[in-house]
Amino acid sequence: PAPGQPALPAPQQEWHSQLMLTAMIAAAKADGHVDERERSLIEAELQRQQADDEERRWLEAQLRKPLDPADVARAAVGQAPALAAEVYLDSLVVSDDTSFMERAYLDELARRLQLPAALKQDLETQARSG
């Protein structure tokens, strides 16, 4: 959880972790491939989550299957607004939005997450500033 936020119950934490990884994977794949930088960011998140072998197999399956912004957004819409913002921010961090395909993916994800334009811009500024 973010600093100052309470820890989620175990089942919710697992769901949240998978959602964030799914968002990162989908953003990385938006241009048709996952490059070395994107893969290392995803691997770092897996390590942070102390992933086991089953979770690593899940990751490999996710990397092979087609993902789209509708699937990612569907899990977040209707939850706390902060979750949609977190999904978008994690997607921004892993993607290189200079690619036309990744930019198009991010714009569609933001639309499906129903992010207000000002929040979308704030998150993009936050992601660029590191």
For each feature predicted by the language model, list its residue ranges.
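Small-residue-enriched hydrophobic alpha-helices in membranes
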Residues: P1-I25, E38-G130
